Structure formats: structure tokens, C-alpha cells
Amino acid sequence: MVCLPCIFLPIMMAIYMKFIMPYVYRFLPERWVHFLDPILYPTCPMKIPEQEKKEEEEEKEKSCCSTEAENTTEVTTETKKDQ
């Protein structure tokens, strides 16, 4: 058998966070909200370095594709002249 606080506390917390907290945040000073947000909604402080890798890959693709694109345009212009 589950104790009653184990059932009611999560339900009450969900109701508070969903319906009551947005109204409370409207009346709090913004400085308090910025102080409380990291405590109430913690996030991982580790930064993911994927952005740098993606930018490097895009630069490599651009350099590869730019030479290929020039070659294809030359070929298409030659074929148009031949026709």
C-alpha cells in the first residue's frame, strides 16, 4: 500500500507548477525570477561542441562543391554551344 503523501504531493506539485506558478511569477520581480529559474529548472552546464564541427564540415563541403559546381557549369555551357 502506498502512503497518502506519496500520492498527493506529486499531484499538488504538478497543479502548482502548471497553474499557480505562472501567476506568482507575474508578481515577482524579474531579478527573483532569474535567480529562481536555475534552481527550479536545472540544466546541464556542459556545452556541446557540435556547432564548431558542423561549421567546419560546411566549409569543407562548400570548398569541395564550389569546384564541382564550376566544372559542371563549364560542361553545360559547352554542351549548349555545341547544340
From Swiss-Prot:
InterPro entries membership:
UPF0729_C18orf32-like
Quick one: signal sequence residues?
none
- Bias class Low complexity marks the residues at 67-76
Q: Where is this region: Disordered?
A: 51-83
- Coiled-coil positions are none
Q: Which domain of life is it from?
A: Eukaryota
Give the family from UniProt. Answer: Belongs to the UPF0729 family.
Spell out the protein name for this chain: UPF0729 protein CBG02799
Q: Which organism is it from?
A: Caenorhabditis briggsae
Question: What high-level taxonomic lineage is stated for the organism?
Answer: Eukaryota, Metazoa, Ecdysozoa, Nematoda, Chromadorea
